[in-house]
């Protein structure tokens, strides 16, 4: 996806949120705030983007958005339970309507047989108590994995929560 197409996707998501009078928050690890960046590239995004949390370290995940240390120790940062807690914690801290959380292994190092480089977990939650998780394994270099994760997060929010509601 080109930068222009990514901007168009951000605009579509933003318009849908604005039409609902809803706000979005993000909790990002491996993407390092890339989702928040492409969202805030859109003029007027303050109407629907509340805030973004870049929680790269486990300590940041625990301190900023309340991910339990026991969850991190038991499952590791790149896991379904962690992205669930990240999304719920971001919603709570930001008092937003929708949350996206992302934690993954962008590479080139850090992968294992169980969690290879390119593994990314996503969490999506709403203030209405809805939520889903997704796991993807992207290929390519570090920047490519991070870009693909950013695109996937926005597309999934759109398709699962905003498109037909």
Locate the predicted segments by residue:
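Short alpha-helical segments enriched in small residues
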Residues: 1-165
